[in-house]
């Protein structure tokens, strides 16, 4: 049964602080916790806040482990738009997390299925994800789990929809440079996280956000599977939350 805690914020900085509070609580309780991390512009205020908190002595990442949601297929780790490089530049290079304790899917792996299985084993060996950061696509995708006729369970390769490629072309010189495939955690891997924190901004996300949490659960809206998670905190700005229940309201469905 979904237990949804809604926190509404006015600015990206407020969102970063609210999300950092969730991560800080987990890290302080379990110093060797496993974070599930995401990329994109929305998590940046969170990452800046986490860096600031460690610099202020409030957090210690030296024992923390992290597993990223996804990576583009075909991009080297040092490619300007690879998610490995994004994480290095925006978080890992600025905190005390050990390089061997950060994993991102290998978009250049010769054997993608074997790499995906190894990725799952690593997360399992670590004891599973304690806190998973998520966003949501305009079509309801989480990670790169695109709308389809089933819920992919484990980490896997996926062909990206034109909607997703169009949404991500702002990070590239042209749509032709946007990869056509990616590697992503499956919804089963995401759902296995003990806690999920979702960060959402923009009026253009209001409809899909409501559909994810209050529409029918179906693989055509991959994020709707979150209705079966027992601990979800949604942090969103007021326009994204236009159709959602009131701030601070805890919804059980």
Predicted regions and their residues:
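Class I SAM-dependent methyltransferase SAM-binding "motif I" and its flanking Rossmann-like core
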Residues: 143-187
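A glycine-rich beta-strand to alpha-helix segment
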Residues: 33, 42-46, 122-149
């Amino acid at each position: 049964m979904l237990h949804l805690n809604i926190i509404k914020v006015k600015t990206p900085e407020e969102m970063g602080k609210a999300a950092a509070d969730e991560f800080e609580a987990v890290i302080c309780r379990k110093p060797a916790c496993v974070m599930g991390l995401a990329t994109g512009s929305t998590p940046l205020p969170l990452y800046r806040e986490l860096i600031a908190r460690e610099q202020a002595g409030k957090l210690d990442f030296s024992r923390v482990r992290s597993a990223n949601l996804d990576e583009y297929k075909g991009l080297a780790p040092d490619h300007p738009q690879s998610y490995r490089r994004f994480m290095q530049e925006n978080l890992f290079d600025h905190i005390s997390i050990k390089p061997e304790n950060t994993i991102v899917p290998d978009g250049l792996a010769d054997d993608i299925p074997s790499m995906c299985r190894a990725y799952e084993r690593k997360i399992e060996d670590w004891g599973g994800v304690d806190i998973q950061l998520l966003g949501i696509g305009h079509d309801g995708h989480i990670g790169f789990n695109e709308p389809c006729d089933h819920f992919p369970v484990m980490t896997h390769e996926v062909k990206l929809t034109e909607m997703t490629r169009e949404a991500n072309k702002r990070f590239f010189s042209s749509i032709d440079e946007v990869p056509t495939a990616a590697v992503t955690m499956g919804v089963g891997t995401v759902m296995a996280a003990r806690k999920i924190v979702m960060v959402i901004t923009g009026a253009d996300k209001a409809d899909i956000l409501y559909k994810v949490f209050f529409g029918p659960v179906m693989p055509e809206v991959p994020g709707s599977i979150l209705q079966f998670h027992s601990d979800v905190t949604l942090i969103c700005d007021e326009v994204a939350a236009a159709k959602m229940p009131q701030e601070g309201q805890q919804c059980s469905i």
